[in-house]
Amino acid sequence: MKMTKKVLVAGFMGAMGQKAVNLVNNMSGFEVVAGLSPIAEDNPEQYHLPASAKIFKNLTEIPDNLADFWIDFTTPKAVYENVKFALQHHIRPVVGTTGMSDEQEAELIVLSKKEKVGGLIAPNFGMSAVLLMKFAKEAAKYFPDVEIIEMHHADKKDAPSGTALATAKMIAENRPEHQTAPDEVETLKNVRGGDYQGIKIHSVRLPCYIAHEQVLFGGPGEALTIRQDSFDRGSFMNGVKVALEKVDQLDELVIGLENIL
């Protein structure tokens, strides 16, 4: 008889958290056993959690051996401590929260290896975003002049998006060292956007948007634009489902959905 896999959802009150709760509720062999939120009321059914699910307001309340998986859609301020806690308690994290530094991610990878606990941090769970990054990395071999525009909803806490930063890192790995317009002068501070190893990143925050990204390449007499659009948060759930099904095959923390596909 197959054992039911137990899932804790951190940030279950948010839009992505609710999508994750709905996903797990409809997955065979998985069950939401708990939620973590500092502001939730102790009424799990109000948040579409099973009636038996426990709601915790902080990490210190969570008992040992509660869950097998930890889905995290919280905030940039909370995510590092959340994932650290999960790894220390041998709960496999599936993390969609962005905003951690490279140093924090590196520390968590070291911890996961020490504890021999697999997990995933994904800047984006959408398949279109994963493919955009893959295609952009390939194009960078031939078009070193490139800029990134990412557009998200007005409530997004971090900028640039984790997807845009991950895209820039992948491009930088595959691109000759290059600085576009090295002699430019800004007459309005930061008008040219953020800079990652010579790659300009522009962040747009507006109502009505969900998650969108364009990578613009320019060359002599030609241009290439790669774009992806997420029109509904439900589009990310296929990636979360894949992660839940695969992370128990890992013995360390992995960055990027593309690395488990």
Swiss-Prot record:
One of its GO terms (biological process) is diaminopimelate biosynthetic process. It is found in: Cytoplasm. InterPro entries: DapB_C, DapB_N, DapB_N_CS, DHDPR_bac, NAD(P)-bd_dom_sf. It is an enzyme of class 1 (oxidoreductase). GO terms for molecular function: 4-hydroxy-tetrahydrodipicolinate reductase; NAD binding; NADP binding; oxidoreductase activity, acting on CH or CH2 groups, NAD or NADP as acceptor. GO terms for cellular component: cytosol. It catalyses: (S)-2,3,4,5-tetrahydrodipicolinate + NAD(+) + H2O = (2S,4S)-4-hydroxy-2,3,4,5-tetrahydrodipicolinate + NADH + H(+); (S)-2,3,4,5-tetrahydrodipicolinate + NADP(+) + H2O = (2S,4S)-4-hydroxy-2,3,4,5-tetrahydrodipicolinate + NADPH + H(+). The keyword Cytoplasm applies. Keywords: Amino-acid biosynthesis, Cytoplasm, Diaminopimelate biosynthesis, Lysine biosynthesis, NAD, NADP, Oxidoreductase. Belongs to the DapB family. PANTHER family: 4-HYDROXY-TETRAHYDRODIPICOLINATE REDUCTASE 1, CHLOROPLASTIC-RELATED (PTHR20836:SF0), DIHYDRODIPICOLINATE REDUCTASE (PTHR20836). NCBIfam families: dapB. This is 4-hydroxy-tetrahydrodipicolinate reductase. It comes from Lactobacillus helveticus (strain DPC 4571).
